Amino acid sequence: MLYQLSYRRRSGEGYRPGIYPSRAMQRPGPIATVVGIFAALLIALLVYGVVKSGPDTSLDSAVSRDAKPVAPGAAVALRRLGSPGTTSLAALHGKVVVLNFWASWCDPCRREAPILERAQRRLRTRNATVLGVTYKDYAADSAKFVRELKLTYPSLRDDKLQLAPKYGTIKLPETFVINRAGRVVAISRGELTEPFLTRALDRALAGSAS
């Protein structure tokens, strides 16, 4: 509140000098009003942005309804880990794919890797594959992880986070089973279990390519 020297009449008295709130400052002017509105809009946008930045659960919702949504980011080509060239989900169309997001610093990823390796050995002759995708990991650390666990399934490097956000991935590990038609039929957010993967693969392998 701003104050200024002014004169006011008191009951039964004349005008007496004193420091009183300035009337000119008691009512906001047009500029202050505009600034206030702008600030309110900015706060609203920030709140909306925080809400929207959360994980995308639309894929989970569709899979829970057995809608078999199209696998996101099929055209995204990522560099292979430990070998030259790139690979995309589109290049694997017609195969059942177990898409697994992982990192060397992720303890649950280390625990579930043997499950994925056993699945890979089972899938080799069935036109299917496990496909790992590293998430926020150094290539050297990822390569060491693969060597230590003797993993034979291929992995790609999502260094620029081109694929993971399309699946709503913000925590590891996460696994998506994709059928021959390129549609997601099962999702595991968190450490994978062998019974879950076995059931999901049996369903995907038994399904049609359409």
Regions found by a protein language model. Name each.
Residues 13-75, 79, 210:
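N-terminal targeting signals for export/organelle localization
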Residues 87-110, 116:
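Short active-site neighborhood of thiol/selenol oxidoreductases, capturing the structured segment around
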Residues 32, 144-152, 157-210:
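Thiol/disulfide oxidoreductase modules built on the thioredoxin-like
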Residues 3-5:
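Short, positively charged low-complexity motifs
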Residues 110-149, 159-166:
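Structural microenvironment flanking redox-active thiols in thiol-disulfide oxidoreductases
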Residues 98-100, 132, 177:
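Hydrophobic beta-strand core positions in alpha/beta domains
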